[in-house]
C-alpha cells in the first residue's frame, strides 16, 4: 500500500491547493461565526466527503454541538483625535479573559467607557477570537497602537458593535473509509478560523487551518480508490478550535467512534509552509514514540525533510482532548512560505503548500502502513 500511496502523491498538490484556496476564499467569511462562515465551510467539507464516497458518521456527516460566541457586527470604526484607525493594523479587540495586570501596567494610557476598556500600547497582541467572558457586560478590551497620545473621551470616537450569542449551533464533520479490521487510523484538523470584522476585514486562514483540512481530505481522496485498507480510516474536521478546542473536546466527550480501537490519531494543523520540515507535538509520549521512530526512518530513507522536531505534549491543538483516550499526536510544518499567523495576510496567494507537499504527504501516509 505504501508504494501505491507514494506513487500517487505527485498528483496531490492540485487538489490540496484547490481545497485550501476554496476554504480561504472570501465566500467563507474567515470560517468564523459571523455570516455563519463555519456552516458554509462545513457544508463544503461535507460535500467533498460525499464526492469521495466516505461513509457518514453522526447526523449525515455532521456532529452538532453548541457554544457561546462573540463577533464583531458591521464595519467597526475608531478615530483617535480625528484620525481613522485601521482595524487589526492600528487596533485590535481582545477578549476580556486575556487582560492581565501587567498588560494594564505596561499600557501607556487607558480609558474605560461604557462599552470597552481602551489601552494605548507600543505593540499589539496576537489576533484571537472574541470568546465570551462569563456574564460580564464588558466582553473585550481594545488595544490601540498609539502610546504617545494621552487619551481623553473627547479625543476618542468609535462605533464598534460586539454581538454575543449563547448556544450557537456549530458542527464537526466526520466520515470514514471501512477497512479489513475495526482498528482505526484517525486523521483530524480544525476548519474554523477567526472570521471577519464586518466587510472591512477578513481573516482568511489559509495556513491556519485550511491547509490542514485540505490535507485530511486529500488523504481521504488518496485512499478512497485503494482497497482493501488494512485499517478503518476516520476523518474528523472540527470547528471551535480557535475558541478553545471546543469541537475536539465535544468529539472526545461524545464519541462517534470507539477510541479504544484507535491505533493512532494524527492531528494536522498549519501546512502552508514546510521549507524547514515538520514538528510533532506529543512526540515524546511512550504510546507515540513507535510512530515517531517510523516517521524518522521513512524520512531518512525516502522523504528527506530537513528536520523532524520532537516536542512534548501541549494543549495547543485538537489532538489534546483525545490524548487520554488513544495515542494522539499533532503535526505542523516548519518554515515558510505562508502569509502570517492570525493575520489577514494568511491568504491563498501566500500559501506555499504545493512546494513541499509531495514529501509531506508521503511521510504522513506512511503511518497508515
Regions found by a protein language model. Give the residues of each.
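Noncatalytic luminal/extracellular "stalk/propeptide" segments of secretory-pathway proteins
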Residues: 29-125
Amino acid at each position: 500500500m505504501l508504494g501505491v500511496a507514494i506513487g500517487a502523491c505527485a498528483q496531490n498538490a492540485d487538489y490540496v491547493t484547490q481545497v485550501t484556496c476554496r476554504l480561504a476564499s472570501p465566500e467563507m467569511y474567515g470560517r468564523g461565526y459571523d455570516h455563519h462562515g463555519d456552516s458554509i465551510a462545513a457544508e463544503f467539507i461535507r460535500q467533498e466527503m460525499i464526492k469521495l464516497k466516505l461513509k457518514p458518521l453522526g447526523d449525515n456527516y455532521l456532529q452538532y454541538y453548541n457554544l457561546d460566541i462573540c463577533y464583531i457586527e458591521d464595519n467597526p470604526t475608531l478615530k483617535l483625535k480625528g484620525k481613522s484607525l485601521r482595524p487589526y493594523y492600528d487596533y485590535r479587540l481582545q477578549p476580556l479573559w486575556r487582560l492581565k495586570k501587567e498588560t494594564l501596567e505596561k499600557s501607556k494610557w487607558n480609558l474605560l467607557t461604557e462599552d470597552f476598556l481602551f489601552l494605548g500600547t507600543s505593540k499589539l497582541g496576537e489576533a484571537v477570537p472574541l470568546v465570551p467572558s462569563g456574564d460580564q457586560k464588558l466582553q473585550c478590551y481594545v488595544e490601540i497602537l498609539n502610546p504617545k497620545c494621552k487619551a481623553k473621551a473627547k479625543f476618542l470616537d468609535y462605533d464598534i458593535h460586539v454581538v454575543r450569542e449563547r448556544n450557537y449551533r456549530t458542527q464537526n464533520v466526520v466520515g470514514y473509509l471501512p477497512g479489513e479490521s475495526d482498528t482505526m487510523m484517525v486523521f483530524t484538523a480544525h476548519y474554523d478560523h477567526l472570521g471577519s470584522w464586518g466587510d472591512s476585514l477578513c481573516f482568511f486562514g489559509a495556513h491556519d487551518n485550511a491547509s490542514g483540512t485540505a490535507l485530511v481530505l486529500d488523504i481521504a481522496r488518496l485512499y478512497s480508490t485503494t482497497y482493501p485498507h488494512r485499517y478503518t480510516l476516520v476523518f474528523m474536521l472540527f470547528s471551535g478550535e480557535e475558541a478553545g478546542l471546543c469541537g475536539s473536546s465535544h468529539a472526545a466527550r461524545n464519541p462517534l467512534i470507539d477510541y479504544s480501537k484507535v491505533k493512532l490519531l494524527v492531528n494536522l494543523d498549519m501546512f502552508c509552509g514546510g521549507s524547514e520540515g515538520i514538528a510533532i507535538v506529543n512526540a515524546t509520549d511512550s504510546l507515540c514514540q513507535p510512530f515517531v521512530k517510523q516517521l524518522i526512518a521513512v524520512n531518512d530513507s525516502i522523504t528527506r525533510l530537513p528536520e523532524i522536531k520532537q516536542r512534548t505534549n501541549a494543549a495547543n491543538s485538537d489532538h489534546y482532548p483525545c490524548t487520554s483516550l488513544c495515542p494522539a499526536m499533532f503535526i505542523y510544518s516548519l518554515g515558510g512560505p505562508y502569509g502570517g499567523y492570525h493575520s489577514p495576510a494568511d491568504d491563498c496567494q501566500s500559501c506555499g503548500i504545493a512546494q513541499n507537499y509531495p514529501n509531506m504527504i508521503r511521510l504522513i501516509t506512511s503511518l497508515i502502513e
